[in-house]
Regions:
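Acidic two-metal-ion nuclease catalytic site recognized across multiple nuclease folds
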Residues: 2-41, 208-241
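Short alpha-helix plus adjacent loop in nuclease-associated cores
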Residues: 163-178
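Short, surface-exposed basic-aromatic patches at helix termini and helix-loop junctions that form
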Residues: 151, 155
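Acidic, Mg2+-coordinating catalytic module of metal-dependent nucleases/exonucleases
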Residues: 132-140, 144-150, 176, 180-241
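Short, glycine/acidic-enriched loop or turn micro-motifs at the edges of active sites
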Residues: 56-60, 167, 204
């Protein structure tokens, strides 16, 4: 994983990253970018939309500095969690993360050093996402880290649209006191999850999204635009408190 000196102009770093990509990765990335241009509009009914529940495990909590260790993603379409439509990758690190981080994620130093090439893993994730909307719990963190790493490793600005499940849940189920992913999992009586594992957290996010999509029409949420508006309104309310 190359680490570019951040004192240099960003566009120069991006060009260098693009030039360093193998031809096969550049071609895959070109197809993904072209496909995204044909993405469905915000008027698409929720029943027809494909969502991707995404979770990232990182080398630390600093979203502007730390790197992605692992990616877990699960598709939700036709209001079903698609267990056969998932993506998981462990990204190779230049050096293993700190011991306390390893204890949290249970991904040892040797595993980290032997992971997948980061550019390959990120292109694979973008291919899996396609033109779908990405859903994450506390999405600001995942979106910031993902977009930064795509820019650093691939030389492009990431284009997936992130929806924050932490804002959607109270928008559709007002009056609850839940805050964390574990709180919501327990609230709906879902099976306990193996926390701090990307694919496990992605499955939990997908199950909670399913519950939101089933209840959304009762709140007048019928389209992707309605879902976006409900999320944004809830985030605005959260900032006002």
């Amino acid at each position: 994983m190359s680490v570019w000196p951040w004192s240099l102009p960003e566009e120069w770093r991006a060009r260098q990253a693009r030039r360093a990509l193998p031809a096969s990765v550049r071609e895959r990335l070109r197809h993904v970018r072209l496909g995204f241009l044909d993405r469905p509009g915000l008027g698409q009914p929720l029943a027809l939309a494909r969502f991707v529940a995404l979770d990232l495990e990182t080398t630390g909590p600093r979203m502007l500095e730390d790197c992605i260790i692992s990616i877990g993603a699960v598709a939700v379409s036709e209001r079903m969690v698609r267990h056969d439509d998932a993506y998981e990758a462990l990204l190779r690190q230049d050096r293993s993360s700190a011991v306390d981080n390893i204890l949290v994620h249970q991904i040892g130093g040797q595993e980290q050093l032997a992971g997948m090439d980061p550019a390959e893993a990120l292109v694979g994730c973008l291919e899996f996402i396609g033109d779908s909307r990405v859903v994450a719990f506390r999405a600001e963190f995942d979106a910031t880290v993902f977009e930064r790493e795509v820019r650093r490793q691939l030389g492009y600005r990431a284009w997936p649209r992130f929806i924050d499940l932490a804002a959607l849940l109270p928008a559709v189920f007002p009056g609850t006191e839940n805050d964390t992913l574990d709180d919501w999992v327990a609230h709906f009586g879902l099976p306990p999850i193996g926390r701090h594992h990307a694919i496990a957290d992605a499955y939990a996010t997908a199950q909670l999204l399913m519950i939101v999509l089933e209840a959304a029409p009762r709140s007048g949420i019928e389209t992707a635009a309605d879902l976006r508006d409900a999320e944004q309104a809830q985030r605005w309310l959260g900032r006002r408190r």
